[in-house]
Amino acid sequence: MKKEKLSGKFWLALVIFCLTGQVAWTVENMYFNVFIYKMFNASAADISAMVMASAVTAALTTIIMGAVSDKVGRRKAFMSVGYIIWGVSIIAFAYIHSIMLTIVMDCVMTYFGSTANDAAFNAWVTDNTEEQFRGKVEGVIAVLPLIAMLIVAGG
C-alpha cells in the first residue's frame, strides 16, 4: 500500500541527520586544509597527502560499511553512533599537535563520517522513501549542503 505522504517524524529525522552530516563535511572541506597549513606550516605535499588519505578512507569506508550496514540492518544505530563519534573526532582536532596526527585524525573522522552519512544515512533514505517521494526528498537533501555552508561560514 502506497503512502499518501511522508510523516513529520521522517522529515525531522531526515533534516537532522542530513544537516548534521553536511555541517561536519563542510567543516572538514572548508577548514581542515587551512588548519593544517596555519597550525603546522604544512607544505602542499602534506595537504595533498591529507586530502588523498581522506578520499581513500571515504571511498573504502562507504563501500565496506555500506555492506556491513546492509547485512546488520541497523542503519539508525550506524547513523546515531557514527554521527556522535564523528563530532567528537572533529573536536579532537583542537588537541592535535602534529601534521601526521592531523592526517590520521582526518582519516578517523572521515571513517565515522562516511559510515554514518555516506553508507548508513543514504541507504536509510532509500529504505524509507517510496519511489513517488524520492524527488521531493532528494530536493531537500540537495539544499541542505548549501544551508550547512551558511551555518558554518556565517557563524
Spans of features found by a protein language model:
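Helix-loop boundary and gating motifs at the non-cytosolic
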Residues: 2-55
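Hydrophobic core of transmembrane alpha-helices in multi-pass small-molecule transporters
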Residues: 19, 89-93, 99-117
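Helix-breaking motifs and short loop linkers at transmembrane-helix boundaries and internal kinks
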Residues: 41, 73, 95-97
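Glycine-rich segments within core transmembrane alpha-helices of 12-TM secondary carriers
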Residues: 59, 135-155
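Helix-to-loop junctions at the C-terminal end of transmembrane segments
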Residues: 61-74
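Structural signature of the two symmetry-related core transmembrane helices
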Residues: 77-92
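Intracellular juxtamembrane helix-capping segments at the cytosolic ends
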Residues: 115-129
